[in-house]
Amino acid sequence: MRRKLSTPTAKTSRRLRTGAKKDYPLDQIRRHLETGPIVLVSSAWKGKTNIMTMGWHMMMEFTPALFGCYIWSGNHSFKMIRKAKECVINIPTIDLVNEVVGIGNSSGEKLDKFQKFGLTPVAAEKVEAPLIAECYANFECQLAEARMISRYGLFIWEVVKAHVATSPKNPQTLHYRGQGEFRVAGRTINLRKKFKPQNL
C-alpha cells in the first residue's frame, strides 16, 4: 500500500526548526555537501519507503551536479535504491541527532522508519522517494552511473532538484568522527578574498 505523503506546512513537525524551504541552484549544492555532513537517504520502491544514515559520500561534478555515495550491499536500502534508481539525500541538523543514530541502528526491512522516528515524508517533485520535512536540505537524485555498484557499492547520482531552508544561515550539521562521536558544525569563516577565482 502506498504511503500517504504530506505537503510541507508551517505545522509539519514539532522538530522543524528551519525556515521555509526554497528551490536552490543545482550548481551550488556543493556548499552543503562538500563539507561532508551526515545525511539521511530516503528511498521508495513498490509502495514502501525507507531511510538510512550515511556518512560516506562526495561531490563529483558541479554542472551537472553529480554526487557519489557508498552503500553496503547488505543494507536493505541498497536493494530498494538499486531497483528504484533514485533517492533523496536529506541533511539533518543537531536537532535530529538521536534520530540519525536510531535510523543507523535499525533495518527498514520490517520497520517503517518514518513512523518509528516521527519523521514526516513529503512528496518530491521529480522522484518517487520522499523528502524528510524535518531536514535542513533535501536533494532529489536520479542514478547517473551504475557501473561501479556491483563491485564497489558506489552509486553516482545526478541531483535533479534541490530544496534548502532559508534559515538558519549556519545550520548545525553533524559530522561523524567514529567511535560514536559527532562533530557539530555551524560557524562559517569566509576567506573568499584569499582564493584564486578558479579555486572557488
What are these regions (language model features)?
Residues 2-200:
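Basic, polyanion-binding surface patches
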